[in-house]
Amino acid sequence: MEENNGNNNHYLPQPSSSQLPPPPLYYQSMPLPSYSLPLPYSPQMRNYWIAQMGNATDVKHHAFPLTRIKKIMKSNPEVNMVTAEAPVLISKACEMLILDLTMRSWLHTVEGGRQTLKRSDTLTRSDISAATTRSFKFTFLGDVVPRDPSVVTDDPVLHPDGEVLPPGTVIGYPVFDCNGVYASPPQMQEWPAVPGDGEEAAGEIGGSSGGN
Amino acid sequence: MTEESPEEDHGSPGVAETNPGSPSSKTNNNNNNNKEQDRFLPIANVGRIMKKVLPGNGKISKDAKETVQECVSEFISFVTGEASDKCQREKRKTINGDDIIWAITTLGFEDYVAPLKVYLCKYRDTEGEKVNSPKQQQQRQQQQQIQQQNHHNYQFQEQDQNNNNMSCTSYISHHHPSPFLPVDHQPFPNIAFSPKSLQKQFPQQHDNNIDSIHW
């Protein structure tokens, strides 16, 4: 496994861990071990970093080349014309997505290092796979990142068939109550057709186990 | 940046635009195919943003960066497709910023919406300032490769008008009724009244600006 040996000089400010409960493990085991590494990111910290993107004062320089974004947008044959604002907004949204994915994945990097012999200071593809599996809003990445069957999704109602654990067991799984600390479930009111769409998408994802 | 087309952007598929404001970076993608590279955003930019939120001892494997590259491209296509569907339902052909924000909201990324709206307001304010401020207008003109030629022609006409008005100023300072006489016709009075000419040039230049706007 090739690693990025470059050290990051910008150290993340420590969150107020004394006010937050310790994060639970994905497998039921008590008591909780002591943590030697910084605490994984809470939703509050994640939202803090995402909000910082909106507070950027320099609106002239963009994190990504706008021409590349426009090419990706226009790879869809239905897309004809876009205003100048569209690639600018998407560039900023991509920054937020990368921060979001990185923080969720780092959560698994730290936890994974304690469960297995895997290094706990290197973020890898499997960490991203675990992070995208557990959050419903990353369902669209099913063809890009393979699902991690060892991770329990946050949405039991939308749990796909054929999963390792049947839906009934997942709902009653004790750890699930603690998972709420990490991510709030999606608001059902905003997706009237979520049950049907979710099941279809979940089914498709389950069928594409050979992806990448 | 495509700041000259706030309403629509008719970019041709094969035409590459100039983005002086975008940071240039080398892509570590092993695939040298140009089309393959265009499918993803530069991996260096992706890695730089990922490092922002990792602790000092955190490292990122190369396959993780490549995976995030793929996720970002999928996200762009996902949002663009949703925005395009909305435009088609509303019989519109151009995707604008509000369509993008709507699509991001609909697809479950509500956490991104408030910061994006803040950013969009700042972006629009900057555009407005550039249009109203002459200095910033010049700066923008320097950055706009496409508009440079047109502006050059306009500037040439403006300079020409300036010269004419300066001549008029010289004649007016001498209280001479006819503005079409050559300057060397009265050399001594011109030198004697140079201070008044300079003072009168300011309101004349102001009028000149109004005239140029009228043109």
Curated annotation (Swiss-Prot), chain A:
It comes from the Eukaryota. The gene is NFYC7. Stimulates the transcription of various genes by recognizing and binding to a CCAAT motif in promoters. Residues 1-10 have a biased composition (Polar residues). Its main location: nucleus. Belongs to the NFYC/HAP5 subunit family. This is Nuclear transcription factor Y subunit C-7. Pfam families: CBFD_NFYB_HMF (PF00808). One of its GO terms (cellular component) is nucleus. GO terms for molecular function: DNA binding; DNA-binding transcription factor activity; protein heterodimerization activity. Residues 1-23, 190-212 are annotated as: Disordered. It comes from Arabidopsis thaliana. It is found in: Nucleus. Heterotrimeric transcription factor composed of three components, NF-YA, NF-YB and NF-YC. NF-YB and NF-YC must interact and dimerize for NF-YA association and DNA binding. Expressed in flowers.
UniProtKB/Swiss-Prot annotation, chain B:
Its main location: nucleus. It is found in: Nucleus. This is Nuclear transcription factor Y subunit B-7. Residues 1-40, 130-151 are annotated as: Disordered. One of its GO terms (biological process) is response to heat. It comes from the Eukaryota. Belongs to the NFYB/HAP3 subunit family. Heterotrimeric transcription factor composed of three components, NF-YA, NF-YB and NF-YC. NF-YB and NF-YC must interact and dimerize for NF-YA association and DNA binding. Binds directly with DPB3-1. Residues 136-151 have a biased composition (Low complexity). The keyword Flavoprotein does not apply. GO terms for cellular component: CCAAT-binding factor complex. Residues 68-79 are annotated as: Subunit association domain (SAD). The gene is NFYB7.
